[in-house]
Amino acid sequence: MPATPFDSVHLSRLFDAGETARLFTDSAEIRAMMIVEGALAQVQGAQGVIPELSAAAIHRASLECQIDPVSLARATGANGVSTPALVAAFREAMQAPEHAQYLHWGATSQDIQDTGLMLRLRQALTGFVAQLDQVLAALAQLAQTHAELPMAARTYGQHATPTSFGAQVASWGWPLLELRADLQGLLDAGLPVSLSGAAGTAAELGADPAALRAALAAKLGLRDPGRSWHTDRARVLRIGDAVTRMALALGKWGEDVTLATQSGLAELRLGGAGASSTMPQKQNPVVPSAMVALARHAGGLNATLQGA
């Protein structure tokens, strides 16, 4: 069995990350870092930091060269990060040492990895917003349809006062609506580029490193943070917090549905999934249970991220 269910073939549909999964593979990480290297060379060539001919060659190679993740494993194990191995493999793949010598000029590993991560997170957050729009539209329709359908509200698992199923559905949607606004706010503010060099001073990046950083941000569609953020992970933590809150809101939804489908209540009935191997009368709340499990998993990961 794989170490995590996300790497399992037979569990892949139970914990299906959909299109998001393709953004967090070795190949996607390498491709994002190569895009950053190519864009960096372009802006350095435009500002005279490296020869324009070499800049064009590096940018073209960043779009054409293919780097096998397996080829980076040994050097990454020795160096602790993958960027040195990637740069070496990239230079070799270019087969033009007169131009390849200017690859990664003045940058440091963290610049390339952080900026590549922001490119992938921007795609992920954009996807989350689109998915939330679909979920919210479905919840709105369900809440409107059942606005007058009475049911018992519960506190501490006990009957409280009358409510409606439409109100229950709306309670699932409100946190997601706020999270949708928060995620869009992160995108509107712009995810930050990183270009500060080995010690965060940008001393190796030419006569005007601030202009170079701003140009790289514009080229990649990212935001210029105006400074180094090598040791300030607040930006990453804010993204992690928003995604965790989304998982927790979905987990609460899953808990409510699991409660409402249990024997003796049967306030809700799910679709045809959730079969038992020995008890044909059962219809297990599989998807709601997965939502709860993922919420708990996300909370633990966020705690790890906060301490990283």
Region roles according to the model:
Residues R31-V36, L237-S263, E267:
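Structured ligand/cofactor/substrate-binding pocket environments in proteins
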Residues A266-N284:
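Acidic/histidine-rich catalytic neighborhood
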Residues A234-I239, V287:
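Membrane-water interface at loop-to-transmembrane-helix junctions
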Residues P2-S196, A202, D208-A215, A275-S276, ...:
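A helix-coil-helix interface module used to build multimeric assemblies
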Residues H297-A308:
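Long, amphipathic alpha-helical stalk/connector segments used for oligomerization, subunit docking
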Residues R91-A93, G254-T258, A295, G299:
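Short Ser/Thr-interspersed hydrophobic loop/turn segments at strand-loop and sheet-helix junctions
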Residues A214-H230:
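A short, charged helix-loop
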